[in-house]
């Protein structure tokens, strides 16, 4: 899979990704930090895009720093669409907080059109209520089920350029979750 000009997965070398931690409204600060990360050997940079006004940050960073850029989107699917139009190289969403299926479909469609991968981010601290009701608390099986549910939702809209990310403060739980996902995916 390609994230801009960086290949990830299978036999590719490990790509280093970092996330900018400057407020989105500080465009120059973000550009400076992105340049420092690239100089330090970072391969991919993720940036939070908290609102539509912040999409300008994507254009600015892309014009100053030649590095694949991942837009981290929460809650508003329109931000993901605008970031895709701004030339972002990957979009990180949690389909469970983007809205109903029509909104997930809109993001999948624009990403398909522009060949932009979508990273599904699943976190043990923010599992869906239905999954927590089933498992009672975060478990590797719960994290796996959430990730695969969201992947299946994207696949329902003919989107298969998917990266799965699972996070937990419990390292053993996280590793077991990845093992379960790997067993169920090709």
What are these regions (language model features)?
Residues 1-47, 51-71, 75-186:
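Alpha/beta enzyme core
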